[in-house]
């Protein structure tokens, strides 16, 4: 009996391995639009897909970022400046994409643009702090997607949304985790709706990687600005030791960040060119072995773990 079971399991994984490695043909005819290509995942993915031969349409926030990217890629790659928080900028970029792809449609849309700041305990933040992140990470994703869906549907293509392990388990305050939970929900509903048209939707859920989003210097600068503007009552409740512990946790976070960004961009590439893409991709060992399992744990257990490892306020009970 155990032999039959072992054979069955072996055949299952062999079939899974084979399906995972089937790649689409005619990649050179397929257009992919990527947001957030100034640096990090977006920039590396644009270079990676360009080397693969795909027609990359790269959106950068700044002209400087676009110029740098063009200098590192082939003449086939084209760039456009895009601020995902401004509807008029999104509309202009969508029109540009439409002119580029013409009747072929848009094979791939990668919503990669994102920010992580301001981040701090919720009580220290304002409504505008939440809006700042949600405008980019969630509403920007929605605006870009809705503007380009007709082109993706025409090509029966792919939508790839960059979420995070923090879209599976919320470990700190501020708009970042909220925005990623929103991306997960938007992607789930979008996947079901677009399945009728042959369009596939995938989510990338990276762990901690060394990018501008996880920059210790930016994180600490933002946090100290938030702390300085906080009310005396809040400062008294949290205390200076909390600030010191928060700084220390930021430094530890940066040390734990994975530097190999290709672990994420390879997932993005697979979602775009595989015959059988996954629905979700957990990128990084911390995502696979720590945060993803945490998302399935009982809530009380996750709360207990976070209570134990997080900085403690001065007036904690």
From Swiss-Prot:
Changing residue 180 to R: Decreases androsterone dehydrogenase activity. The keyword Lipid biosynthesis does not apply. It is an enzyme of class 1 (oxidoreductase). GO terms for biological process: lipid metabolic process; retinol metabolic process; steroid metabolic process. Inhibited by citral, perillyl alcohol, geraniol, farnesol and geranyl geraniol. The keyword Repressor does not apply. One of its GO terms (molecular function) is electron transfer activity. InterPro entries: NAD(P)-bd_dom_sf, Sc_DH/Rdtase_CS, SDR_fam. Belongs to the short-chain dehydrogenases/reductases (SDR) family. This is Retinol dehydrogenase 16. The gene is RDH16.
């Amino acid at each position: 009996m155990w032999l039959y079971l072992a054979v069955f399991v072996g055949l299952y994984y062999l079939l899974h391995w084979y399906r995972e490695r089937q790649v689409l043909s005619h990649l050179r005819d397929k257009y992919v639009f990527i947001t957030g290509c100034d640096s990090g995942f977006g920039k590396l993915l644009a270079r990676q897909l360009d080397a693969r031969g795909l027609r990359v349409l790269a959106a950068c926030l700044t002209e400087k970022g676009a110029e740098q990217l063009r200098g590192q890629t082939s003449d086939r790659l084209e760039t456009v400046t895009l601020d995902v928080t401004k509807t008029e900028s999104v509309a202009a970029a969508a029109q540009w994409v439409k002119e580029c792809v013409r009747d072929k449609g848009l094979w791939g849309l990668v919503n990669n643009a994102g920010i992580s700041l301001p981040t701090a305990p919720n009580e220290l933040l304002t409504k505008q702090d939440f809006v700042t992140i949600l405008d980019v990470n969630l509403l920007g994703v929605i605006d870009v997607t809705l503007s380009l869906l007709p082109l993706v549907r025409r090509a029966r293509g792919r939508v790839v949304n960059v979420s995070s392990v923090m879209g599976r388990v919320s470990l700190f305050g501020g708009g970042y985790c909220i925005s990623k939970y929103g991306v997960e929900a938007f992607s789930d509903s979008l996947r079901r709706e677009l399945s009728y048209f042959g369009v596939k939707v995938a989510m990338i859920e990276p762990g901690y990687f060394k990018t501008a989003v996880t920059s210790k210097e930016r994180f600490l600068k933002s946090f100290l600005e938030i702390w300085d503007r906080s009310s005396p009552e809040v400062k008294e409740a949290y205390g200076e030791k909390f600030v010191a512990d928060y700084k220390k946790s930021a430094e530890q976070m940066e040390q734990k960040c994975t530097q190999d960004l290709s672990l994420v961009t390879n997932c993005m590439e697979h979602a775009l060119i595989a015959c059988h893409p996954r629905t979700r991709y957990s990128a990084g060992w911390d995502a696979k072995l720590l945060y993803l399992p945490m998302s399935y744990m009982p809530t009380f257990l996750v709360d207990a773990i976070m209570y134990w490892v997080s900085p403690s306020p001065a007036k904690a009970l």
